[in-house]
Every structure is written in structure tokens, then in C-alpha cells.
Amino acid sequence: DIRSGRRRVAVVGNAEASLTPELFEGFTNMGALGTDEGLCKLDGSSIPDWRRASRPFGENCGFTLAEGTQYVVLMDDALALELGADIHGAVPEVFINADGLKKSISAPGAGNYVSFAKAVAAAVAILGENTVKNHSFIHAHGSSTPANRATESEIFNRVATAFGIDDWPVTAVKAYVGHTIASASGDQLMSALGTFKYQLIPGIKTIDRVAADVCQTHTSFPLQDRDVRARGMDLALINSKGFGGNNATAVVISPRKVGEMLSRRHGAAMDDYRLRLEQTRQRAEDYEVRADRAELDVIYRFGEQVIDDSAIQLSRDGLTMPGFGNAVIFDKSNPWKDMS
């Protein structure tokens, strides 16, 4: 909608509160969840290590349910400059593809090859081969299941082979927060924006080693935080999968690279933008200070401007409400005249 001009701003996000008996039972019946028994068996222990329950791309036994929420504000480039918005990144493309026919509803399928390869091809077209080969990283779905670690890593490596990419860093935020279901890709996006800001790729710290069936021919899976300030990361590929066979891959560009692109399009207007950006950041800092002091200035209007039901005027043609200039006009057309 933003690219077509239908919208100038959009709030995008999700929230999920999945820690309920019904969801636990459903995912358990699918054999998708990690269990205390499974963790103990992996570790040769009688006590489960819950801090390391989610183990993407390591020896694992299922994912860990979690709850979360993530939201981002998207706007077109001209509006962002006009408002002096603090730009944390840009999303030029998102590709979605279903698996189609397959043997199991919960098994990984072929659709992710399409979404991921399309995303890499788009990134090359937008930013060039050098950025994709040397200054990009992958935020994997990394659900902490044996099937995911083998199949997703194979996708990454086969696409890397096709595009001539080596030593491609792969991380997985579910090692830190578990699987928040609807907002899981939002977790990945927020972590990617953090990498752009601090130039650190978070390590998959819940595993001691990468599992033997994980394909690592052209990829690397850091187990500790990786400092990439010298290399510089300007591109993240966020990969997401869903039970039922849907897949999505997003291209996310760093604010540094976005700044270069905006300068080429808007030229001298960037000087005015930078002045507005300073004001925006100062207001954000001031708000943070007030919030720390619980000075939230909450707008509370309970009981104000309540519509008086008795003042509603009704007729056969429509109705009017106090405080609204336009009436509600009834649609009297019959779309089923042939059946009436």
C-alpha cells in the first residue's frame, strides 16, 4: 500500500499470549514442543536446564512457547523526512510463498526456497552483490526443532551457493525469547535493528555446538556475540515459517544504507531533515526521562463527549447523531432483485 501510494503510514505488528493449556496440548500432540524429559535426555541430566530450553541449530527436542508483542511504524520516505522521523531501517520487499502439497501439515516444505531466494535476488538488485555477499546476515526462523535445523540450514546454503555467498552469518533470536508465535518475526526484526545500531550479531548461546545435520558449507552460526563493526552489516534477511505451510522472507536495510539511498533521491532536502531529526531525538530523550519519573501525561477522558442516545434522530432514510456533521444514510438498493 505504501509503495503504491494508497497509504503513507502504517502500524504493523502482532501480539500473542499463547501460554494456555489448549495451545500446550495442541503443540504437544504435534510433537513440536520441547519437554523436560527431552532436555534431560539431551544433557544426560536429571534436571532440565530451562535457561537453555530453546536451542536453534543445536541438538534440540522442540520449541519453547513464549508470549510477546512487537510493533513498528512504516511510512513513505517523503513523510519520514517531513516529520524528522528517526529511521531505524527500511523494508523494501517481503516475499510470501506457501509449500503446496506435502506429506505432513507440520513438516517444512518447498515454499521457503521461493521466498528466501526471491528476497536475496531482490537485495542484490537493490543494494548490489557486494553488500549481499559481504555485509548481510540472516535472522533464521530457528524454531529449535530437529526438522527445522536441517531443512532451513539447507535452504540457506543452497541459496548461498547460487549467489556465490560464503561465511554468511546466521543467528536466531528464539534462543533468547523462545517462540512467541504471531510476533516471532517481529522479535527477529527488532533484533536485526539492534544489530544495525550496535553492529553486533547475537550468538546462539544456548547451544554448545552446531548439530551435525546442520548444513554449514557457506554459512556460519556464531555461538557467541559477533562484533561486525569492521565488516559492517547493512542488510538482514528475516526468514519465517508457519505450521500449515506458509513462509515469508523480508529484506531489511540498515539506516546507514537507507541514508545513502535517501540522499540520492532527495538531495539537499536531507539537510533540513537532519535538523528535524535532532529535534525528534531530543523529544524522545525528554519523553524517556519523564517516563522514568512516571510522568506519563496519560490522556484519560472517561465520560467525556458521550453520545446522548435520546438525541439520535431516526427516519426511514437514515439517522443523525449529535456531534457528527454527516448523517448515516441507509442503502436501500437490493443486490438480489432476481431472487426477490
Task: Label every PLM stretch briefly.
Residues 1, 73-76, 116-119, 156, ...:
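Buried hydrophobic packing segments
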Residues 6-61, 94-109, 140-149, 166-218:
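Acyl-CoA/ACP chain-elongation machinery
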Residues 10-14, 74, 92, 237-240:
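Short beta-strand segments
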Residues 38-131, 136-137, 253-322:
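Condensing-enzyme catalytic core mediating Claisen C-C bond formation in acyl metabolism
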Residues 65-69, 112, 152, 182-188, ...:
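Catalytic-loop motifs flanking and including active-site residues across diverse enzymes
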Residues 119, 123-127, 131-139, 149-176:
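A beta-strand-loop signature enriched in Asp, Gly, Thr, and Trp
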Residues 197-244, 249, 258, 304-313:
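Internal helix-turn-beta structural module
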Residues 318-340:
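Extended non-globular C-terminal regions
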